[in-house]
């Protein structure tokens, strides 16, 4: 059992962690921060005057501009 655990940790460290370091642009993205940078607001529903750009954190909230 320890043998399997050792190889699982080794495989995880060799694949997942190195891929995260090599390609940081594919990591997690803070969509709320991206919305604020583009002068948007995270709301449940956009008004008629606002334009819905993307989702914020949850699929139910939208970035409205």
UniProtKB/Swiss-Prot annotation:
GO biological process: defense response to bacterium; innate immune response
Disulphide bond pairs: 35-63, 42-56, 46-64
GO cellular component labels: extracellular region
Signal peptide coordinates: 1-19
Induction behaviour: By androgens.
InterPro entries referenced in this protein's UniProt entry, alphabetically: Beta_defensin_dom
UniProt keyword annotations, A-Z: Antibiotic, Antimicrobial, Defensin, Disulfide bond, Secreted, Signal
Pfam families in the cross-refs: Defensin_beta_2
UniProt subcellular location: Secreted
Keyword Magnesium: no
Tissue: Isoform 2 is epididymis-specific and expressed mainly in the proximal caput.
Family: Belongs to the beta-defensin family.
Functional note: Has bactericidal activity.
Name of protein: Beta-defensin 41
Organism of this sequence: Mus musculus (Mouse)
